[in-house]
Amino acid sequence: MVGVIVLGTLATSAAGCVINDLWDRDIDPFVERTQARPLASRALTVQTGIGVALISLVCAAILALYLNRLSFWLCVGAVPVIICYPLAKRFFRVPQLVLSIAWGFAVLISWSAAVGELEVATWLLWGAVVLWTMGFDTVYAMSDREDDLRLGVNSSAIFFGDKAANAVGLFFVGTVGLLAAMGINLHLHMGVWMAISAAAIVWFLQYSQLRKVDIPKPVYGKIFSQNVWVGFVILAGMIVGEIF
């Protein structure tokens, strides 16, 4: 089951990334951070991109057939969200929320596949993932703010304006609160509390950086990348907390 979930996640993530680049291929060349992407730079053709996306989706669909009924239908529900996310920036003022919900499906699908149902702790973890994603992807959007304003596309960084750093801080505080609530609900032990504490410290330091004036653009990317490792720490803590 773990193998199915991991491979399915990789296939879905690959499809989502390619679909995003397909939708944005006429925008990405004019954004400093994304202008070197294969479709934006014309290193890959649109036909190749569509082919990769379809193959990835087919692989994900085949793997979904090995899941229970609830998990399968959650996979089906995730597809339109993943496909529509890149369009959200054109019509919705906070497109990062759509991305956050898309990421949240990973929690719902994995949990239901393992347990067979969605529990209180499931929704607490789902909420934590949604808020966490809102936080780190708002940071990512802060590096593109000038380009997005010029191109007329939306982002949470633009929506929150000069309060974006405070919004990120609140998202991270909410994430810590929901993770703690999940830990209490599941009676997890020392491992998860150590992981949550470590994550909280990192997020506080990141928030402190974002509060500074005239932040170099590479800092936003660095903070975004740090959250990958924060995720691994939290995952490890949850595993240790469940086992011991």
Regions found by a protein language model. Give the residues of each.
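Functional transmembrane core segments of multi-pass inner-membrane proteins
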Residues: 1-4, 70-78, 82, 96-151, ...
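Multi-pass membrane catalytic core of lipid/isoprenoid biosynthesis enzymes
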Residues: 2-9, 25-75, 150-190, 196
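Intramembrane alpha-helical segments
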Residues: 7-9, 15, 37-125, 204-211
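Alpha-helical transmembrane segments of multi-pass membrane transport proteins
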Residues: 8, 12, 128-132, 196
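Transmembrane alpha-helical segments of multi-pass membrane transport proteins and ion-pumping complexes
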Residues: 13-17, 21, 61, 137
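Membrane-embedded alpha-helical transmembrane segments of multi-pass integral membrane proteins
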Residues: 15, 56-59, 81, 128, ...
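Interhelical loop and helix-boundary elements at the membrane-water interface
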Residues: 22, 26-52, 83-102, 146-170, ...
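Extended hydrophobic alpha-helices typical of membrane-associated regions
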Residues: 181-244
